């Protein structure tokens, strides 16, 4: 397949640095794989410094040219594994080999591996770009410390000193991230650039809304890793306050450490008579997710902590009306086209009211509003995003980042 984006005049040697490129169900890794694929299609030489796939599945991008052994983390190893993730053990000799080849480095995380590579790249004179993919609270939420402001500020300061200030450019995937980083007075400039979504992936044009079964059923979809910060628990609590709960059919797409608790919460709703249809839990591929979205009336995105939330956009562009959490650490509400499609993060009663408002407007109103979202993805076309990323790489290699 030939990428429809432009072709860069000069082929670059681009080194991607990520602990685990091959995990599935992780938006960071999926975004990196898409970007790597497009860059290769445009003629660039892209190599990867990462742990190899544990199950042998290279996810279509090939095994890492610079493999690192997987690292077992004491105490929290099982928690990390439950998030579908793995850390790589640093091998400085391998890092140096990779840097000898690279024109430019792209760091995908703010962890120890990236700190070492950032330091070595700076010493070797190889420019590095880092993408801000996660907040400190994405990490601390798993151990119930996401509201420990001092701790999270300390983590961000550590990232600033060990990684960000050793790079030449910091990519901010959303305005929300830019607003958080701008007051930190980082040494490198900030680049406001979405990670982007592939407009054609998983879209077959079919729309089954109202075609399946009882037209009185309200089908709601939520997508995201099952974890505290994604806050699927608020969606389930909201059903207790919804006037239309008994008409709602809810599907939660994902997997993760809170699945057991969420299933128990969903079972209680059914046994208490709050809902009449069991909540469906499933991990879906892109085509499966597209089919599910084509039959849904509403999409709910409840995450309290979200750098960009492209999983939401991949559903909305199929014409589904959203109800999205709004808060200081979540950027996903940027996709909402009206105030009626937002609620305050963590407020289950407010979410219930928002759902009820859309249900009471009727199916035709949902179809009309959903049509407004079909073109939304064009603003975040990954091909256009990679165009700008290429420009950034070229400026870094030529030591001109003043216009980033």
Identify the function of each model-found stretch.
Residues 337-348, 357-363:
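Conserved acidic donor-binding segment of nucleotide-sugar-dependent glycosyltransferases
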Residues 110, 304:
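Aromatic "clamp/platform" in nucleotide-sugar-dependent glycosyltransferases that forms part
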Residues 321-326, 330:
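Short hydrophobic beta-strand element within catalytic cores of glycosyltransferases
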Residues 52, 176, 196:
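Carbohydrate-associated surface elements
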Residues 99, 164, 283-284, 291-296:
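Short alpha-helical donor nucleotide-sugar binding micro-motif in glycosyltransferases
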Residues 260-284:
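Nucleotide-activated donor-binding/catalytic signature segment of Leloir-type glycosyltransferases, i.e.
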Residues 123, 136, 151-169, 184:
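Membrane-proximal helix-turn-helix segments that form the acceptor-binding/catalytic region
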Residues 15, 171, 209-240, 251:
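Conserved donor-binding/catalytic core segment of Leloir-type glycosyltransferases
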